[in-house]
């Protein structure tokens, strides 16, 4: 399976000196578009993560019975874009206080998550959550419900979903943030 825009193989290994992270912030179509446009992002793909079932389908994930989340895997060059920059995009692109939904998209598969493969990334992600929580509270929002944990699996979604908004520019995207900017250090 190839990336619709870059033509890279979606099964590619992460290049040496590059890093990866998985974000869930609602429907994966809009979330992926937020990240594929960034300088320093080498490859994006959409998939399912967090549940126990091996290689689930979209239909079974949407049933809410597998505990999987619709996610975007982001492989990036940390010499060009930092994890802090990616986290800023993540926090600002959705409302992390909504629990098991994002806007009109309702269900556990739309919950806010960050899945990591590095303790260093985990610490930076947790710190960014605290920073953004303070900003949200100043603007009347409740607690962030984002799950931050080590990645246990990642299954590519069906080709139809990969880079969906590049293939379907007028396709549905219910992604919407809080309007609160991530504070600059």
What residue spans do the PLM features occupy?
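Flexible coil/turn and secondary-structure edge motifs
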Residues: 1-185
């Amino acid at each position: 399976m190839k990336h619709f825009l870059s033509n890279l193989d979606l099964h590619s290994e992460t290049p040496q000196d590059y890093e990866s992270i998985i974000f869930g912030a609602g429907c994966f179509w809009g979330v992926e578009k937020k990240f594929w446009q960034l300088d320093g992002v080498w490859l994006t793909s959409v998939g399912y993560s967090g549940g126990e079932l091996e290689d689930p389908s979209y239909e079974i994930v949407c049933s809410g019975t597998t505990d999987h989340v619709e996610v975007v895997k982001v492989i990036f060059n940390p010499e060009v874009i930092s994890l802090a920059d990616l986290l800023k995009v993540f926090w600002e692109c959705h409302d992390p206080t909504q629990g098991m939904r994002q806007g009109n998209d309702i269900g556990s598969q739309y919950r806010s998550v960050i899945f990591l493969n590095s303790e260093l990334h985990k610490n930076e992600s947790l710190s960014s959550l605290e920073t953004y929580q303070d900003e949200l509270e100043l603007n009347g929002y409740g607690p962030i419900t984002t799950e931050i944990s080590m990645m246990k699996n990642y299954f590519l979604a069906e080709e139809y979903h990969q880079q969906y908004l590049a293939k379907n520019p007028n396709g549905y995207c219910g992604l919407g943030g809080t309007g609160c900017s991530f504070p600059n250090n």
